[in-house]
């Protein structure tokens, strides 16, 4: 009987480390960014019309229940996008641009234009986002936001907390790309 309780206890301890899975895509419950452990705050599937486009995951040092808490959180952050279908670089660039414009003021957009231009150039250089491709945006306060594609850094970090906050607003802003995706990234149901 003690063995059963020990095994049950070990299973319960391991459960928080198990991956979350959406549409066959596994997302780790915890990740390391710049030596700091981040936890999966929420995950969701981005849809457009009837098409499932990508699985998104938001990682933060401390769980956040509101968009403001997530956007303003101190320390490293990570957004993971795993493609569920192919998308051209132009489609991806247009989607990011539309999300930035819908959720940031003209002044905020102007302030991060150099970083936005860098990100768009990196996306164009990568080319088509293929089904299964893992796109990661890691933010490290002293460095900036780094784009990774399938684990490979693309270019150098794009400086500034304001840029990272502008990007997060694409998914968490007042007019997010998808409302139920925002709610799920903040720990709610999708």
What residue ranges belong to the model's regions?
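Cysteine/selenocysteine-centered motifs that mediate thiol-based redox chemistry or coordinate metal-sulfur cofactors
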Residues: 179-190
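N-terminal structural module
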Residues: 20-72
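Mid-length scaffold segments of soluble, non-membrane domains
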Residues: 64-142
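Envelope-exposed proteins and targeting segments
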Residues: 27, 36, 54-56, 75-79, ...
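Sec/Tat signal peptide C-region and signal peptidase I cleavage site
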Residues: 15-19
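Flexible glycine-rich active-site/ligand-binding loops centered on an Asp-His dyad
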Residues: 154-181
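Short strand-turn-strand beta-turns centered on an Asx-Gly dipeptide
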Residues: 149-152
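Sec-dependent signal peptide recognition
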Residues: 2-10
């Amino acid at each position: 009987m003690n063995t059963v309780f020990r095994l049950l206890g070990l299973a319960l301890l391991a459960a928080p480390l198990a991956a979350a899975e959406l549409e066959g895509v596994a997302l780790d419950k915890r990740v390391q960014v710049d030596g700091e452990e981040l936890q999966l705050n929420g995950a969701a599937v981005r849809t457009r019309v009837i098409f499932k486009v990508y699985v998104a995951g938001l990682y933060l040092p401390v769980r956040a229940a509101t968009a403001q808490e997530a956007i303003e959180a101190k320390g490293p952050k990570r957004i993971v996008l795993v493609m569920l279908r192919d998308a051209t670089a132009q489609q991806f660039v247009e989607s990011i641009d539309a999300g930035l414009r819908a959720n940031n003021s003209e002044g905020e957009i102007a302030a991060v234009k150099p970083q936005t231009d860098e990100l768009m150039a990196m996306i164009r250089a990568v080319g088509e986002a293929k089904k299964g491709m893992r796109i990661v945006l890691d933010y490290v306060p002293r460095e900036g936001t780094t784009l990774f594609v399938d684990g490979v850094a693309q270019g150098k970090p794009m400086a500034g907390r304001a840029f990272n906050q502008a990007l997060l607003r694409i998914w968490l802003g007042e007019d997010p790309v998808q409302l139920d995706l925002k709610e799920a990234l903040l720990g709610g149901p999708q």
